[in-house]
Amino acid sequence: MMRNVQSFYFLFLLIVLNFHVVLSAVCIGQRATTTIWLNQNGDCQDVGFCQYLQNCTCWHGNLVVKSTKYYDEENFKPYFPKLREITGYLLISLCTLKFFHLFPGLTVIRGGDLILNYALVIYYNEIKEVYFPSLTAILNGGVHIGRNHRLCYVNTIRWKSIIKDIHQTGQYGIYLESNKLNCDLGCLKGHCHPAPGHDGDPKAQYCWGPGPKKQQNKAQCQRFCNTQCGPEGCLDGSDHICCHHECLGGCSAINSTNTCHACRKYRIKSTGQCVSKCPRKQYLVDKFLCQESCPYWSINSTEYHHYLWQGECVTKCPVNYISNNQTKKCEKCKSGMKCNTVCKYQDVMADGTLYNGALIRVPSDISKKGLVGCSVFEGSLTFQLQEGTGKAEDSLNELKSLKVLKGHLKIQKSSLKSLNFLSSLEVIETPQNALLHNKYVMAVYENSQLSELWPGNESIIVSDGGIFFQYNPRLCPLHIRNLQDRIHYKNGSKVTGEVSLQNNGHKVLCDTQMLVMHVEEFIPPDLNMETDMTAIECNSFKCVKVTWNFTMTSAYNNILFYAIYFKELQSNQEAVVQLDNECQNNDDWNVITVDIPKIESLEQSLFLQSKIISKLTPYTRYAFYIKEIVSKGEERSSHIHYINISQDLPSEPLGVEASFLSENKILLKWRAPSKPNGIITAFKIYYNKPDYSFWEEQKVLDWCSRDASRDKNAKDVAGYPVNKENYNQYCNISCVCDEEKENSKAIKADREAHNFNVEFQTELMRVLFTKNKFSYRNKNKSPPKIDFSKNISLILSNKILTSTSTTVTQAKIEIIEEPKVTVNGNIFSYVISGLDYFEDYELKVCGCTVVGCRRPSSTINLDCGIVQARTGVNLTADNLDSKMVRVQVQLDSYNISWIAPHKPNAVILKYEISIRYALDKDALVICRPGYLPTYIIRKSRFGNYVAKIRAISPAGNGSWTEEIHFKVAELSVTKNNNQLIIGIISAVSAVIVALLVFILLYMFLHRKLEKDVQGVLYASVNPEYMNSKEVYIPDEWELNREKIELIRELGQGSFGMVFEGIAHGIGDHAELRVAVKTTNENASIHDRIQILQEASIMKAFNCNHVVKLIGVVSQGQPTFVVMELMGRGDLKSYLKERRPDDGGIPLMRQEIYQMVAEIADGMAYLAARKFVHCDLAARNCMVASDFTVKIGDFGMARDIYERNYYRKDGKSLLPIRWMAPESLKDGIFSTASDVWSFGVVLWEICTLASQPYQGKTNEQVLNFVLSNGHLDYPEGCDYQLREFMSLCWHRDPKMRPSFLEIVHVLENEVDDDFVMVSFYHEMKRKALEDIYMKSESYIKSDAYTMSDGYTKGDGNMQNMLSRSQNRKSAIEKSKERLSISSLDSGTYVEKYDANDTPEEIPKKKKRPRSKRNSAVDSNACETKPMLRVESLYDNHDAFSENMQYGDTPVGKSDLMHPETNRELRLSEIFYGKPIPV
């Protein structure tokens, strides 16, 4: 019984365990790389293979996913959820899928094979989003994601957590380039945080997409596992429960080797179990799988035989072992037995031809191409190792076992210093057809670093051919001679050596005989099927044809071949052939070898030879010369010939950058192309919105449950890494001659990136367009093919290299895009305006030469610079119109409707409707998606309600509308009487509505008839062309239109454009520069009346610190208002120009106080004239050419001569950020409210035109100011200016200082020019003159106040007589520093002395004003000692009894603190106590 229970329990455990077991299906491709073809609908083109791959959990090999233009009627969607492991690389390119979700279960990419060091490549696709939610490990190789102009969520992945090889750094590690910029990235709120050990920021988020979506309710988070678990990974659904140590990348059950997603070492193919070593009777295959037999063990197949060696299946036996085809084993060589490890390899060259041998470009090619441990290599070996590819000698030592080479040996343009790795070479058996140039068994040439060969005295036996050593500047000829003595043919004779003693080692090249050569640019003929490949290349590239004479001489047998040398030169540079030192050598010459012609008859004595050289740089000067390479005797060469290659289309501009300037402007910058290929005549700019926008997914994404988040990682510059978490700094170390160094690091970086992209694209082309097939393809269908005869040049230019066929598929028609802007070739920036708010734009810059212009191309070869940018935010674009919000109440429900914003920021994502029941404290906020109709209908209980609405866009939240109050009435009737009551209510409502409409119409017409000029409707026969003189009476200010000449636009005014112009014959001026305000052509009559009313207001002003009116042109259209020209524009723009961060000169302290005094003086003048400005701000203050600041823009000014304040009616736009609390609350505008605005202007000056209340909406500003709030004082600003602001922002308008008082305090801070022309000093001088005249006449008077005029006292004659002499003396002293203002603001009179009388003062001679000093004062915003508050005059003693503020006399003693004996602060003078700042 117990045994049965134990058996049952064991069986139960086995069932539970097997429930978690994932059956492993390892699939092995018949080729190293297999392609998944997708048609235009995204269906599998090869259904057989896709069905086969769907059942695979591991793919042994490389996978390529790409689309084809060809279409088969299949409906098989690619989806491979079981695939968890790829042993090679994964390439996704030329794919038109929108969302790439093909491999949701892919966990590990081993990187056994790489594309230029990359294991995952996503390149040049139209994919918007990739999704690898299970990917946790890339064992070898890096990640390259580039040229995907729609792909977002690239930088929200922490690639460093996926790449496991810490040595994969720099551009060969993680390279993310030219993907979609300005993505609005945001992972699902509250999700996607990394596990411990991956990121120091616990709030960081990493995800593959926004999530959730309707199709899948997932957060799309990147999968993380606690780093303490190591590479084995975590249990599915957990980030801290570790898997078995034999696992890799994760598992589906813990403590089990059967549930691993991938194996850390080996996997048993039959069961999927992960093991550290293969069990008995199973063999290790490809260092990856354990299986019962080696693959391809077949009697009929010997090509892919595997052999057993120490429990492993190998394709070749190691050193000292020999393969036995009978036993399929590697047997150890017996003593005295000749034991060789035979290797062979067939390489593919860049042009697609096969090379019977191995081409070694990088050290890793030794192991990648199976050459490690080879003793016999059947094929040729070519070494072209470039500098910077690693320690080549260490990797090449793996070839030290090479003894027999059955091909030629070629070492060319290599960075090798020694050939010691060939020290074991004994035999070179080269077939006749394998000789290099049909002559050479060994060729070593153009190796700049090679200094020694290999040591030893052993002989080397060659079967045929000779040796060739040329242009090895560091290789001593003695070494070559020693090696040559050791090389013998099989018959014992020494090998012939074609070795030049002139160009091996440090020798100077010299010629005794000259060859005749001719060079000309080659124009290819029309293409046809008989055209050779060289001519086809010349159709796309520049070519040169080199021709020379070959003369038959007795030395014919000594000529090996001809070498054509050529190189690029500067414009007028001469070429020099020399080998002087390390930097100036012959390595900068390119060389092409040409075989000598075959002599059919000895009677021929003269031959004409030619060679076409292609791929030359257009618009470049080249030098050419040709030389004979001989085995012995003298070498002949030609003179150096020069040729200028013609122009061609330029390459793409470099450094294309875009940044927003405002809500509808983008600044586009670029640099000249790296290959201009001629003189750049123009640049054509294309821009449009991308055909895909992230916000178009608003119908799929639930924005009511998420917040819109901008990409905070995105940089302004396109094409550079944006997420520093995924990048390591790198640099290329190489020897560069001083004269070749770039002047600009940015240009050098651009060129290095360009060269790297060329290298990567070349390797990518080799992978993408290599012929490939798979055995599971449907046999009833032929693969896609192309007819080359249709368009050879198109095939070459687009690199479409596929199989040939007799069937032709219709090509996709490309829409030609027209340029939006064309600029000159010497311009490298442009401001694009008129764009939509907060929208993404794709901008392209294409260069032009005299040959033509590049155009944006849809192919992988990009011809234009491409960048993406987004415009700025319009702060009011998302605001809803409160007037358009409607509420309809129907019994127990209500309907709220509104009108969407006309031009929002990007798109409205959602609306928030706040509804509060009158008896409830909190409001209910309802979300309405932006794509739905703008209304909501809700059931409700009876009572009063308050509602408001706001719109939310990608730019943020709009302002709330005004609150709407409505009531849902209680139902008090029975259900049976509902219809009757509704009918009665409807009838009564219709009658009431009709009466209301009639009454409103009557009132509207009646008011229209009674309006005055500001609102009168003037009748006219032709109202749209109404003449201004019907509403405006010309006076002495009227000017002749013909005397006004408009020059250029200055900007937009209140009613139309503002122009700079010249007024001819105005007053004493022959020509006077003026500013001219005009109305728009389509301006209404009301606008024309308004501009004339503004001009009428200005007629009353004559102050140096108020913009002056020159005249009016009211006759005809358009109306002109001619004003004084303010050459430096408005104060706000001028302050921005002075920002040090933007290269401006900071304001000095004197300038700040001068500006403040001039503004206060101008406002004091307006206050004295009983005018309230209502819109005082830095934008409405103007700066003249001599830096004088004046008050301007009276569009809102009102005359309040008979009342002290103005209550504004209506609801027009108001400058809320500058308005006083009483203006915001009650609509009261007065001089005191202008003082509040003046304080805001002070704040603008101190912050150099920053936005007041930055970060707050208008609604928030309104509530903040009404809640006793005001602006924060600028940091580091002068203490007195801060105290001025505090005084101006007093809550009680009566407690704010007047403008004259402000100027009085600043009197000692202004320059002499201000004293001559200010309104304040003019009032002061009038008071002085009045006192002077009355003192002379002994008029009975009391003390006078000098602040705003003078007042009479008690008339004490004796006191007046006793003080008159002192007063007169003080006046005469004060007059020495005063001068009288002239009516001409541009001049002032000379100073008068004490003997001048008031009648003599105006007779003084005028002289020009001095320019203001604009020197830099770095301490302009630092705290200064307190201003000295003095009396109106310098002499305290003389006038201490005559000073007063209001009704309180102020003397010298009153200006001192009674306890500390210090000077009083401004607030202490005005209010009697300090006001805290």
Curated annotation (Swiss-Prot):
Its cofactor is Mn(2+). Coiled coil: none annotated. Residues 1002-1477 are cytoplasmic. Residues 1356-1368 have a biased composition (Polar residues). It comes from the Eukaryota. Keywords: ATP-binding, Glycoprotein, Kinase, Manganese, Membrane, Metal-binding, Nucleotide-binding, Phosphoprotein, Receptor, Repeat, Signal, Transferase, Transmembrane, Transmembrane helix, Tyrosine-protein kinase. PROSITE patterns: FN3, PROTEIN_KINASE_ATP, PROTEIN_KINASE_DOM, PROTEIN_KINASE_TYR, RECEPTOR_TYR_KIN_II. Gene3D superfamilies: Hormone Receptor, Insulin-like Growth Factor Receptor 1, Chain A, domain 2, Immunoglobulins, Phosphorylase Kinase, domain 1, Receptor L-domain, Transferase(Phosphotransferase) domain 1. Residues 1403-1412 have a biased composition (Basic residues). The active site is at D1175 (proton acceptor). This receptor probably binds an insulin related protein and has a tyrosine-protein kinase activity. This is Putative insulin-like peptide receptor. It comes from Hydra vulgaris (Hydra). The gene is HTK7.
